[in-house]
Structure formats: structure tokens, C-alpha cells
Amino acid sequence: MGNKWRVLLIVLVLALGGVLAGCKGTDQSSAEGKAGPDSKVKLSWMAILYHQQPPKDRAIKEIEKLTNTELDITWVPDAVKEDRLNAALAAGNLPQIVTIQDIKNSSVMNAFRSGMFWEIGDYIKDYPNLNKMNKLINKNVTIDGKLYGIYRERPLSRQGIVIRKDWLDNLNLKTPKTLDELYEVAKAFTEDDPDKDGKDDTFGLADRNDLIYGAFKTIGSYEGMPTDWKESGGKFTPDFMTQEYKDTMNYMKKLRDNGYMNKDFPVTSKTQQQELFSQGKAGIYIGNMVDAVNLRDHASDKSMKLEIINRIKGPDGKERVWASGGHNGVFAFPKTSVKTEAELKRILAFFDRIAEEDVYSLMTYGIDGVHYNKGEDKTFTRKESQVKDWQTDIQPLSALIAIDKAYLKNTGDPLRTAYEELTEDNEKIIVSNPAESLYSASESERGDELKKIIDDATYKYMIGDITESQFDKEVEKWESSGGKQIIQEYEEAFKQAK
């Protein structure tokens, strides 16, 4: 990154909060937070930069034109976003729009609770797109039952299975629909020469050292395991204290013991996991369904045929999949720089506007004919020659998007189309975390430390280093080391939120 950008990014902690331009429209439009035809709204914005360079001005200028705004965006590199945010909160120098990714950061929680940011729950009903925001995700980003920002939407669940369809066909196997059938496919992929090369060189599942985004948590949801926490009558139980968690460990242990998955998965990276699949050694991948595109693109066998599965029946015959919070933080509005209700309404009107098809399409797909090609029936394609410009001009703008409207479907890639359709279908079977919107100070301070106790015990059990009773001892250690306090704090927060 050049010196110019370094200097620009360092100034985040300086004041960026100019007062919004006055409205020249009628009193009616002012009350509704809508700018008059001749009044440009000036907005200062702290945004997160997930790419090497900020987007070029061309797209920004188009957004300003469509929304009648002047955008003063400070791009903060992803690696330093928390430090810069904490410094800005401490100094009290904040722009009008603040991107907050970790809403349970202790500094952020204190800022919300102290009244530093506007509470917008009573306002969004006046804006048609904001009023249609997903109610579950809105609940997930509340703090003490209050909504302090517009969520940055992400899919609630992208988890599923990528499987070698050509291997299924070679062995005359049907697509698995239950956990038992999935196990039998893993066995056949290991023992029955699915690639028909006459060699004993394949196995079923390729997994990695990730109990969340690898296979474990998704298989757990198929088993009926709760998503992080189980709530019953106001009492909270962590997932690893349930029988379904042990059933998941036993399922994975059985796969490993019989050689139907890579034995070294606790020390396998995601790159290594994907290489095992792409190089034709494994035929089952469990994780983010969009990874199917990358697995295919890096395949050593270009004739590889893949299928994506999102529904697997558990022992009780039900289909489930675990859900994330459905967000990547919020856009929040500090009272120090958004001084009046009228100014807040102007900003809310802006976010409502960028959810409309013309602005959203510009920020997501780019300029028709330059970054993509719009087809009929709400579809689009992107040529290889258009990808680079889209990546540099448009992709960084995803950091500015709140509501994911997905007006167009990409028909240029059947695998990506399948991923999008199945991700949408997942919303019908998701299992949410009942503690998602709750706050525990002990969890915030010591959660990662305590989680390591359980993670280590889980891996050790699955590879046969400890017994079930020894695993239970580690759970007791978690409780005595602070886990009981976390449970109590969640139960109290749940009671207060009702």
C-alpha cells in the first residue's frame, strides 16, 4: 500500500463527523428524513477494507449520484479494525456511520449501554426496505433488547456437503439423505475404488482442524446437537454437555477409526483439506457449500463432477443445520456526530435507498456491460475478462452493504447457482443459538480460553487418546474454571431480555 493510503488510514481517529447538510425540501420530507431534490447529504463513514486497495472513485461517484449524497469514506484495514475502533471510541471522535464488526467487544458494549449511539428500533418501520429486514437477524444484533444499528447481512447458514457425483455414479450409489447413508458412502469411497484406477488410494471424508466450519458442527446439527447452547425454561446448557455432542464425536471417531476420513484431521489446515479433495484423494467435503466452486476449479481431474447437498436426516428423521448470527456486525450512528433525529432519519433513508435494486446492483454486481452482463429473468453472467475490474472496482463495496437483496442470480456457473439456492433453502431448517443476542462478561473475557479446554478434549476423544469419562472430567474442569459463571450470566441476561 502506498504512503498516501497509509496516511489516509492513520487519520481514522481524527474527527470525521461533519454535520449533515440541511434539507431544502418541505417540512414533511424533513420529518421523514428524506432530502429535498437540491440538498446533497454529506455522510462520513468508517468502513472496513477487506481488500488490498479501496474501490476506485468511479463506482463511489455513481452511488453518490443515485443517492444524492457526498460520501467521505475512511477505509480501515481489516487487520487493525478493532484497534482503530477502540481508539476512536475512547477519543469520542467518530464519523456519522461507524462499521462495528464485533458488537460484543467490551468497549462497544459499554458505548451502546452508555447511550453513545442512537437506538433505531422505533424508526425502521418508516422505511420500506429496513422494515423488511430479517426479524431473526435483527434480534441477533440487539443489545439488552435494543437495536443500535443496521445489520450487515450474511447468510444464516451456508453449511452443507460437497460430494463427488462421478464417484457416486461409478459405484451406482444414490445421493445420501441420512447420516447412515453418508457413512456408507464414506466407506464405499474408501473401499470400493470409486475412481476406478485399480488402486487403493481414496477415502471418504476430508476434514480439518476446525470444529465450527469444518465437518464437526455440521454433522452435529444433523445429529440434533443444539447450536452452541440449548435453552429450556430459562436454563442454558452448552452444546458439549448434550448427548448429541457425544453422538457426533462417536460418528467422527468411527469414520476415523475405520480409515474413512483423514486420520490427521486435527492438524490439517483448510488448504490441505481442500487439496485432499481437489487432488482426487477424498470424495466428501463438509463445510461452506460455496467451497464447491474452489474445489472444482483447483481439481487435478478436470472431468470431476460435484453435487452439493444441504439436507441430511438425523436419527429422528428430522433435517436441521446450524445457523450463524446472520450478520457481520452493524452500521451504528453516534450521537456525537449525528446530533438530531432529523439527521438520523436522513441516514436511515440513505440505507433504505441503497437497498433498492439500482443502487444495490451497482454496489454488488457493478456496471452492466463493464463488470457483468444482465440477462433476462433476473439473471446475470460475468465474463472472465470482467472479473479483474469487478474485483478492484466493485468487490470492496460489499463492506458498505447492509441488506442482502440478491436481485440477480448468477447463471454462468451451475455450482454457484446451486449454492445460492441451497443456502436460501437452509433457512427453512436452521437451528439458531438462543444466546446469540445475549451478553456474558465472562464469556467475552475468558470464552476463548475456556473453549480450548473443550476443543482439546473433543479432538483427543475422537482420536482415541481419552475415554468418555475423561472427556466428562474436562467438562467439569470447564465448569469449575469459569463455565458455571458463563451459564449463570446467560440465564440472567435471558431473564432480563424477556
UniProtKB/Swiss-Prot annotation:
Signal peptide: 1-22
InterPro entries the UniProt entry points to: Bact_solute-bd_prot1 (IPR050490), SBP (IPR006059)
Disruption phenotype: Deletion of the gene has a negative impact in the utilization of polygalacturonan and rhamnogalacturonan type I.
Record-level GO cellular component terms: plasma membrane
Keywords assigned by UniProt, alphabetized: Cell membrane, Lipoprotein, Membrane, Palmitate, Signal, Sugar transport, Transport
Pfam family, one: SBP_bac_8
SUPFAM superfamilies associated with the record: Periplasmic binding protein-like II
Covalent lipidation (S-diacylglycerol cysteine), chain numbering: C23
Membrane topology type: Lipid-anchor
Location in the cell: Cell membrane
Lipid-attached positions, N-palmitoyl cysteine: C23
TM spans (from-to): none
Sequence similarity: Belongs to the bacterial solute-binding protein 1 family.
Function: Involved in pectin degradation. Part of the ABC transporter complex YtcQP-YteP involved in the uptake of polygalacturonan and rhamnogalacturonan type I.
Subunit (UniProt): The complex is probably composed of two ATP-binding proteins (MsmX), two transmembrane proteins (YtcP and YteP) and a solute-binding protein (YtcQ).
Name of the protein in question: Polygalacturonan/rhamnogalacturonan-binding protein YtcQ
Natural source organism: Bacillus subtilis (strain 168)
